[in-house]
Amino acid sequence: MNNELEEYLDFAKDIAKHAGEVMIKYFNQNNGASYKGDKTIVTLADTEINSYLIKKVKEKYPLHSVDGEEEQFGKSDYVWVCDPVDGTAMYARHIPVAVFSLALVIKGQSMVGVVLDPFTNSLYTAIKGKGAYKNGEKIMVNDYALEDMKTVCHYDLWVGADY
């Protein structure tokens, strides 16, 4: 199973590389931001990345399924879960605080994951039981209690708006 998981990770990294290129391509131009029925924002990058993932999964792993934020495909014990642009609201406003995230869930267990920040060229990867990495370097989680890690952040999305 370990070699298989490494293969899945390589696949996920390839998808992430393409996703990062798409995110950068649309970032400084008209990104086609619009509202979905649930009032959340979607951009051209979201839909293009999601469609690309489904195409590639169908080609390489036709028995797997995809649960993408913008579109789903198939029903399987092997599910690629994707948020093509995690942070779409910021991305749509040309604020570089968004990432691509993809995980492979096998029989309900997250086994492989990648998160790419295309604005800092940071690629985070993990295989269950093998640790987490940033750009190939092992990283560690801290042991702080959650309540000790509270952060408050404020910014104006609409400068000049009459609140």
Predicted regions and their residues:
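Short polar/acidic secondary-structure junctions
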Residues: E71-F73, H94, V105, Y144
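Residues that scaffold the ATP/ADP-binding catalytic core of kinase and kinase-like folds
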Residues: Y26, M90, N135
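A short, compositionally biased
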Residues: N28, A98, A126-K130
